[in-house]
Amino acid sequence: WTYSTEVLRQSRATAGNTLMTLCGLAEEYIDTSFTQYSKVVNANGSVIAIGKNSTTLQSGQFARNQQPTSGQQEITVTAFYKDPPGVGINNFNSLEYCVTGGLSTTFYGTENEMCLRAEWAA
């Protein structure tokens, strides 16, 4: 799919692009990562991020695919967020952003090209 707006949104504007965690005891950090393949052209860029309980604000470190001049660049990047120990239910949302409004970024979303995951010690 393509996206051409300078607004952070949930990936593909689809509510299902989320990962839910439930913690009953505040002992472990939750390491989340979001990996995605994207294509940008003509001095455009794309950003992916993780939003903890948000579809419009990023948490942690975002990842960028930036094409500095004309041409095309295709790359897989990974965003990270380390969530501190806490109790309750949290949603970690995959987010996307187009750096230069009006120019399209192509995001790919099959299981081979997009993965949102969480890890913690057991």
Where is each model-derived feature located?
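Solvent-exposed, flexible loop/coil segments flanking beta-strands in beta-rich domains
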Residues: 1-24
